[in-house]
């Protein structure tokens, strides 16, 4: 029975003026003394730490299993701690029963049950809710194939940073790491007191993002601040924990870097890379016609495809691709953000070999595609004309003459020596109802369970929106949009005109049956071989010139008010109060 529900506004941004800088550990993350721990171990007494030989083998066998099946969320609520094996926490089980909250229930043409039967939309008891364009849904539990988090991923520190945030290969030369290491060397720990919050950048479902400066340096970061009490009351602590765990394991040029994270009594903070170029949604709105040229689209989606490929190799299903979540760095390249809706699953990478006629033809001609940066023109990295055979090798000084050479036997259907890495978590299944209306895959709306194929559906919607300035199934309302996704065929507008390969790629990605969808079997490897990406040098894509480089950002600082020692300061007028409202919550720092 559906109920009419008003769309819920995003949570209020935390009042940073009320932040308390604490230097003690959070009471919710308690440790056990060695003497108490010894009393809890089978075969040991509290007086003696000598192990019982009869239970040593049992301890060794069970220790690894227990460590891999327990996830501490930092909450005092026992329901927030995952049980061992495939058991589902009570809180998550309760959320899954009402995972659809209020999206399909608002209509007058037909009853919800009739519409669900006609279009195959899954029904749910109780109230229903589906997130809007800027709102995200609740993350439910996944199948038993999903990999549980380990307790080692959770920091036991409160007001100081996690020691697990260390320099990673792709950011080895980042000046921001040097600034952070300098503060750590000087003070030992890194906490909220070391940052100055300058302005608010945006607000999401579980927190707000602020532009921050590391004190004593000119290094700027994006700090995501989450109110722990609000997360607990809205049952979103697990989502915040999932995002932190995913960010900790990422090391990719097109994915965010988690420099540090820390907690106070009230807030949980993630310190990440600041992207001054904004997001692709804002950038698209500034384009003529509100859509990108096809060459620019090819650049952006190629980098996103590599980021998605990396995530799937780690067993991470993103589930929230949209222009608002694609940020533009200062050099014009992109960065994928927001991982609170992501799903972590098991994956088995496979290395296979496949035939490649182009590579075989090059082998016969004694040539190869050059992989040296000095041999490639970066400005035309994604132009088809740049994909011409070349070689970095000089002539052989002691080669035999052609008369002395013996002809090599022709090999029919020879397999290319270039292997393909397939790492697609295709067996993952989740019943969660998460995402954005216009980007939801049909299998999510029908409630049939979904896996990694939903990322390739959203990738197709994303490609369509960048090319045409709108999504393909958008209706007059959220309810109509869902019905269009299920029952309406894919159509292309007459204008703007795009290439046949672009339309063909979108058709392959927006197949309503997930088993027939492009990328379902071989993942990003299959998509990268589509003619739309012809001429893209995947190995050197970071050397390509971006379509647009954002202008340098000038950081505006609040003016310092002079302090008079002779007369008491007068109360500010209403106009002055309104003009300085944007800085009031940062005065504390």
From Swiss-Prot:
Transmembrane segments: none annotated. SMART domains: S_TKc. ATP binds at residues 201-209, 224. Keywords: ATP-binding, Kinase, Nucleotide-binding, Serine/threonine-protein kinase, Transferase. InterPro entries: Kinase-like_dom_sf, Prot_kinase_dom, Ser/Thr_kinase_AS. Residues 195-533 form the Protein kinase domain. SUPFAM superfamilies: Protein kinase-like (PK-like) (SSF56112). Residues 91-100 have a biased composition (Basic and acidic residues). Gene3D superfamilies: Phosphorylase Kinase, domain 1, Transferase(Phosphotransferase) domain 1. It holds the Pfam family Pkinase. It catalyses: L-seryl-[protein] + ATP = O-phospho-L-seryl-[protein] + ADP + H(+); L-threonyl-[protein] + ATP = O-phospho-L-threonyl-[protein] + ADP + H(+). It comes from the Eukaryota. Residues 15-36, 63-76 have a biased composition (Polar residues). One of its GO terms (molecular function) is protein serine kinase activity. Residues 142-165 have a biased composition (Low complexity). Its EC number is 2.7.11.1. The active site is at 320 (proton acceptor). GO terms for cellular component: cytoplasm; nucleus; plasma membrane. Residues 1-167, 551-589 are annotated as: Disordered. May play a role in the regulation of metabolism and signal transduction processes. Belongs to the protein kinase superfamily. Ser/Thr protein kinase family. This is Protein kinase G11A.
């Amino acid at each position: 029975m559906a109920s009419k529900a008003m769309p819920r506004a995003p949570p209020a941004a935390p009042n940073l003026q009320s932040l308390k800088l604490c230097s003690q550990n959070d009471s919710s993350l308690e440790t056990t003394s060695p003497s108490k721990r010894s009393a809890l171990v089978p075969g040991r007494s509290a007086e003696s730490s000598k192990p019982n030989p009869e239970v040593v083998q049992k301890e060794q066998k069970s220790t690894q299993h227990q460590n891999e099946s327990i996830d501490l969320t930092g909450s005092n609520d026992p329901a927030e701690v995952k049980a061992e094996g495939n058991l589902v926490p009570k809180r998550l089980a309760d959320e899954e029963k009402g995972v659809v909250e209020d999206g399909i229930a608002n209509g007058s043409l037909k009853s919800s049950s009739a519409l669900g039967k006609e279009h195959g939309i899954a029904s749910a008891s109780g109230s229903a809710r589906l997130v809007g364009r800027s709102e995200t849904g609740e993350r439910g539990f996944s199948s038993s194939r999903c990999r549980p988090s380990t307790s080692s991923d959770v920091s036991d520190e409160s007001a100081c940073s996690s020691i697990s945030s260390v320099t990673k290969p792709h950011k080895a030369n980042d000046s921001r790491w040097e600034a952070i290491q300098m503060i750590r060397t000087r003070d030992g720990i890194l906490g909220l007191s070391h940052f100055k919050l300058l302005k608010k950048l945006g607000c999401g479902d579980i927190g707000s993002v602020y532009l921050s400066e590391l004190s004593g340096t000119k290094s700027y970061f994006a700090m995501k601040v989450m109110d722990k009490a609000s997360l607990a009351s809205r049952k979103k602590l697990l989502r915040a924990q999932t995002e932190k765990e995913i960010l900790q394991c990422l090391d990719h040029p097109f994915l965010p870097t988690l420099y540090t994270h820390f907690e106070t009594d009230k807030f949980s903070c993630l310190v990440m890379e600041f992207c001054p170029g904004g997001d692709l949604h804002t950038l698209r709105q500034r384009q003529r016609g509100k859509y990108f040229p096809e060459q620019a689209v090819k650049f952006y989606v190629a980098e996103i495809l590599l980021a998605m490929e990396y995530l799937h190799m780690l067993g991470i299903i993103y589930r929230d691709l949209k222009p608002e979540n694609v940020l533009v760095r200062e050099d014009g390249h992109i960065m994928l953000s927001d991982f609170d809706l992501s799903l972590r699953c098991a994956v088995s990478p496979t290395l296979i070999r496949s035939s490649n006629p182009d590579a075989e033809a090059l082998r016969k001609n004694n040539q190869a595609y050059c992989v040296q940066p000095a041999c490639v023109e970066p400005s035309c990295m994604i132009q088809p004309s740049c994909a011409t055979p070349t070689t970095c090798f000089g002539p052989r000084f002691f080669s035999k003459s052609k008369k002395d050479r013996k002809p090599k036997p022709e090999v029919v259907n020879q397999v290319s020596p270039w292997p393909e890495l397939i790492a697609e978590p295709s067996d993952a299944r989740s019943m969660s109802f998460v995402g954005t209306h216009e980007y939801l895959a049909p299998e999510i709306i029908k409630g049939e369970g979904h896996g990694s194929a939903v990322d390739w559906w959203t990738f197709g919607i994303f490609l369509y929106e960048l090319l045409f300035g709108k999504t393909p199934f958008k209706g007059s309302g959220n309810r109509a949009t869902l019905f269009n996704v299920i029952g309406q065929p894919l159509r292309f507008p007459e204008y703007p005109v795009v290439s046949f390969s672009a339309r063909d790629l979108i058709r392959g990605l927006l197949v309503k049956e997930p088993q027939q969808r492009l990328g379902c079997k071989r993942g990003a490897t299959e998509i990268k071989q589509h003619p739309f990406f012809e001429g893209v040098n995947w190995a050197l894509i970071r050397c390509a010139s971006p379509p647009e480089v954002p202008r340098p950002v000038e950081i505006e600082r609040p003016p310092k008010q002079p302090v008079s020692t002779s007369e008491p300061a007068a109360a500010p007028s209403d106009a002055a109060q309104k003009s300085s409202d944007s800085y009031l919550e940062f005065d504390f720092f």
